[in-house]
């Protein structure tokens, strides 16, 4: 998959209309809806970026990258339905000529306590209580990366953070597939 597959983008700015709901809450809802739309289209050619990200926040803007056709299918699916009061969407725009590229990927903590407990329970036939006693929450190492709190459309897992890692800027695109979240550990998205 070449850069031509990511020739267009949709920019979604998340708004915080009142004190009740934060920009990060809106971003979580937008990202969750996008995940559902990507999953329902069974596609791996849609990537995301967070151009206003900071050290600990993904920021208020989500860019969705893809071909004009892929983005049209996404919009036709109505993934921003009922979020219009909380977002400003650009519609489909061509990527500018002079851009850099970067990988926007999911990062996972190596020492997730729930994951280690499940493995311990499976391998040693322990109860959840025994596993919790052996592996307390305090062993977790927090990632110093921005995250989005989501619940999965494809599994019944409760809400969990997805940590977002922005790779170095590159002068050439790197092809590859994107996950159901629009993230990839190998493929790049246009960065501008």
Give the positions of each predicted feature.
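Short, charge-patterned binding micro-sites
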Residues: 47-58
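Structured alpha/beta or helical-core interaction and ligand-binding surfaces enriched in interleaved
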Residues: 61
């Amino acid at each position: 998959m070449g850069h031509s597959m990511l020739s267009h983008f949709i920019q979604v700015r998340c708004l915080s209309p009142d004190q009740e709901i934060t920009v990060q809450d809106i971003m979580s809802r937008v990202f969750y809806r996008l995940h559902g739309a990507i999953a329902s289209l069974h596609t791996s050619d849609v990537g995301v970026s967070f151009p206003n990200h900071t050290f600990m926040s993904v920021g208020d803007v989500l860019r969705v990258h893809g071909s004009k056709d892929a983005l049209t299918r996404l919009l036709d699916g109505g993934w921003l339905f009922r979020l219009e009061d909380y977002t400003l969407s650009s519609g489909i725009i061509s990527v500018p000529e002079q851009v850099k590229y970067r990988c926007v990927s999911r990062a996972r903590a190596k020492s997730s306590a729930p994951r280690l407990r499940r493995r311990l329970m499976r391998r040693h036939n322990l109860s959840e209580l025994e596993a919790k006693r052996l592996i307390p929450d305090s062993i977790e190492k927090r990632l110093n990366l921005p995250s989005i709190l989501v619940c999965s459309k494809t599994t019944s897992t409760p809400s969990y953070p997805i940590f977002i890692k922005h790779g170095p800027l590159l002068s050439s695109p790197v092809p590859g597939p994107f996950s159901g979240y629009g993230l990839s550990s190998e493929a790049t998205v246009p960065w501008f």
